[in-house]
Design a protein with these regions (language model features):
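Residue-level detector of alpha-helix initiation sites
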Residues: 16, 164-165
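Active-site entrance/lid segments in N-terminal catalytic domains of soluble metabolic enzymes
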Residues: 1-157
Length: 231
């Protein structure tokens, strides 16, 4: 469905998942994703064009549907001919007909069986079942209990994410393909600050924290998972 050599998807991460990282992952045989989070529409457009200069392999764009310019980005990726989209923080239903007309593969990120079923009914081609071990805004279920329940409930492919950092993690949840995010933060190909890359590389198993509650339209409150910093 995705046209990739290896079952590895690089998740969309704000400030990290740029054209350079997406192209590097795609050139290596996985699926690279450009993040549109906290980015202007033209900036995302430029990253798409840059990625096409860096790779002739499949790549996609991640859209945060709660963003003020989500509608503009939804229209832009349609016009630009992006082939693969992942979505989060909202329902892509209002854009689905337009994207389907263009043959775009739409893969929402979900944190529950109920949301996964809604996305399937809306016409999603697959879903990313992302457990609470993931970074960023997370749900309540952890990856191990979440993924099997979503697999059993859906008729479309399910991609596992959350706490997976290598093939052993993917084998544990028995998912092919699987999505990685934080694993790519320390790589030199993207433009994130060097201090962040180095700190991520040094982190152990007790440096990730859950804090705060954020309001989303499809979920009243969502926790946020992040690295601990000395300030």
């Amino acid at each position: 469905m995705l046209g990739i050599q290896y079952p590895v998807i690089q998740g969309g991460m704000a400030w990290v998942a740029d054209a350079s990282l997406a192209a590097a992952v795609s050139n290596a045989g996985g699926l690279g994703l450009i993040s549109s989070i906290n980015a202007g529409t033209e900036a995302v457009h430029n990253e798409i064009r840059k990625c096409r200069q860096l790779t002739d392999k499949p790549f996609g764009v991640n859209i945060m549907l709660q963003a003020p310019n989500a509608g503009e980005i939804a229209q832009m990726v349609f016009e630009e001919g992006v082939r693969i989209l992942t979505t989060g923080a909202g329902s892509p239903a209002q854009y689905m007909a337009m994207w389907k007309e263009a043959g775009i593969k739409v893969i929402p990120v979900v944190a529950s069986v109920a949301l996964a079923l809604k996305m399937q009914d809306a016409g999603a081609d697959a879903v990313v079942a992302e457990g609470a071990e993931s970074g960023g805004h997370v749900g309540e279920l952890h990856t191990m209990p979440l993924v099997p329940q979503v697999v059993d409930a859906l008729d479309i492919p399910v991609i596992a994410a959350g706490g997976i950092c290598d093939g052993r993690g993917a084998a544990t949840v028995q998912r092919d393909p699987f999505q990685l995010q934080q694993r790519f933060v320390g790589k030199q190909v993207h433009t994130d600050h060097t201090d962040h890359k180095q700190r991520d590389h040094r982190n152990g198993d007790r440096t990730q924290q859950l804090s705060g509650l954020c309001h989303f339209s499809l979920k009243p409150f969502a926790r946020h998972c992040h690295l601990s910093f000395p300030f």
